[in-house]
Amino acid sequence: MVEEVLSYMITNKDGIYVDCTAGEGGHIKAILGYTNNKAKVIGVDVDYEVLEIAEERLKDLSDNVVLIKSSYKNIDMVLRGLGIDKVDGFLMDLGVSTFQLKGENRGFSFTKDEPLDMRMDVQSEKDAAYIVNNYSQEDLRRIIFEYGEEKRFAHSISKSIVKNRPINTTQELVDAIRKGLPASQVHERHRHFATKTFQALRIEVNEELKNIEETLSKFESFLKVKARVAVITFHSLEDRIVKNFFKNNERYNFLTPKPILPTQEEIKHNPRSRSAKLRVVEYLGA
C-alpha cells in the first residue's frame, strides 16, 4: 500500500512528515523518494534492533531523516524535543514487522521455538512468559476473548494454559493451546490455531490498543490545517479504534470513506498484507 500512502498523505513536497512506526525504514525511504530534497521525516520506533536496520538503510538520506527510539505514545515529547511545532502528516503502520517475526529469540512467531517474549521494546519489564505464568485463568480468558477475538474457545484455552504451566517457550505455548482446542480447530486450514492467542498476548504485553488511541489524540496539536494522517491496521480491534476516533472527532474528515485494501498482486508478494486496511483523514483545524 506504499503508493496509496504516498498519494494520500503527501500534500507538501517540502514538508515534515512523521513515521510513528519507522520499522526498517521502508516507508521513510518511499516518502523521501516522493518528496523534494527539503523534506524531512521523523522516524520513531520502540524497537532499537529495527532502528539499526533503518539507520543503515537510510544512511544516504541522513540529512533528511531523524530516527528516535521511543514509543509512538510519546510522540508529543519527541517532536517538542526536536523543536518541531507543526508537521504535514503522520503515518502509523501497526502490527508486527517481518524482522520481528523472523528475528531470533523475539517470541512473536508460533512457527519457531523461542523464549516466550513478544516485547517490541526489549527493555520493558513485562514479557509474554510473565503473563502466561502469572495471570489468573480469568484474566487469561479475558485477554484471549477480547484481544484475540477468540469467542468460542477462550475458556478452554486459558484453562489448558494454566494446567500446563510453567510455559516458557513459544512451542510450549502452542502445545498448551492445542490441548485446549477440539481437533477440528487444530486442523482448520485457513488460519493457524495459535494465531488468536498469540495476537492477544502480544497486544497485552505491549499495551497496543491503549497506546493507539492515546497517540491519535496527540496528533492534533502538531498538524497543520489540511495535513493528513494515514493509519494501516491489521485486525478489527485496531481498525475499530482508528475508525471511531476519527469518526467522533469533527476536526477530521475521512478521505477514505471505506478503508483501502491491498491488491491481489500485493497479497501475492506479501501474504501478511492480506488483512491490512488503510484509512486516511485530513485535519480541518481547531
Swiss-Prot record:
Q: Indicate whether Nucleus appears among the record's keywords.
A: no
Top-rank taxon of the source lineage equals: Bacteria
Reactions catalysed according to its record: cytidine(1402) in 16S rRNA + S-adenosyl-L-methionine = N(4)-methylcytidine(1402) in 16S rRNA + S-adenosyl-L-homocysteine + H(+)
Q: Where in the cell is it found?
A: Cytoplasm
Where is S-adenosyl-L-methionine bound in this sequence?
Answer: 25-27, 45, 79, 93, 100
Residue intervals passing through the bilayer: none
Annotated coiled-coil segments of the chain:
none
Which biological processes are named by the entry's GO terms? rRNA base methylation
- What family does the entry list? Belongs to the methyltransferase superfamily. RsmH family.
The record describes the protein's role as:
Specifically methylates the N4 position of cytidine in position 1402 (C1402) of 16S rRNA.
This chain belongs to the protein called: Ribosomal RNA small subunit methyltransferase H
Instruction: Say which species the protein is native to.
Output: Petrotoga mobilis (strain DSM 10674 / SJ95)
Source organism phylogeny:
Bacteria, Thermotogati, Thermotogota, Thermotogae, Petrotogales
